[in-house]
Amino acid sequence: MPIKTIKIMVEGGNVKPGPPLAPTLSQLGLNVGEVVKKLNEATSSFKGMSVPVTIEVDSSTKKYEIKVGIPTTTALLLKEAGASEPSGDPAHKKIGNLSLEQVIKIAIMKKPGLTTKSLKAALKSMLGTAKSIGLTVDNRDPKELVKEVEEGKYDDLLAKYENEWNGVKE
């Protein structure tokens, strides 16, 4: 029972039954409409974002499994900030503001795809991305917050989310 793996990026909740997906699914003998419907259901919580998806197909039984990945950090930060795209000039043109708690929640969401072992390190990574796309956090430059996170200023806040962080499977 050879397993065929298809890795694609789709728009959350808006997968269309066209190329390049449809021909690949048809070649494997799958019902394109059914797979697209299941993909849209599986990715609906990431509406409007680019989402990595893996479809594993058993070519002998035609059974398949859809595994939804997590959108990029940039996509999650932009969605949370209500912005459509990163700033072309992040040093001078800010596109939105997030609270530190919003950034912590995104760090927790991204845990399975991160190499960092602690919530503190993950938060610093998210803050770096926020800075690079032109977001402020708590109406401040994220670089300032990284320094304060390193100094332990937010350890109490991070402790509040530690159980949630530890509960996420890697």
From Swiss-Prot:
- Residue stretches spanning the membrane: none
Q: Which SUPFAM superfamilies match?
A: Ribosomal L11/L12e N-terminal domain, Ribosomal protein L11, C-terminal domain
A single Gene Ontology CC term: large ribosomal subunit
- Name a single GO biological process: translation
InterPro entries in the record:
Ribosomal_uL11, Ribosomal_uL11_C, Ribosomal_uL11_C_sf, Ribosomal_uL11_CS, Ribosomal_uL11_N, Ribosomal_uL11_N_sf
User: Does the keyword Disulfide bond feature in the UniProt annotation?
Assistant: no
Any one Gene Ontology MF annotation carried by this entry is:
large ribosomal subunit rRNA binding
Q: Which UniProt keywords apply?
A: Ribonucleoprotein, Ribosomal protein, RNA-binding, rRNA-binding
Fill in the subunit field for this protein.
Part of the ribosomal stalk of the 50S ribosomal subunit. Interacts with L10 and the large rRNA to form the base of the stalk. L10 forms an elongated spine to which L12 dimers bind in a sequential fashion forming a multimeric L10(L12)X complex.
What does the UniProt record say this protein does? Forms part of the ribosomal stalk which helps the ribosome interact with GTP-bound translation factors.
Q: Which family does it belong to?
A: Belongs to the universal ribosomal protein uL11 family.
The protein, known as: Large ribosomal subunit protein uL11
Designated gene of the protein: rpl11
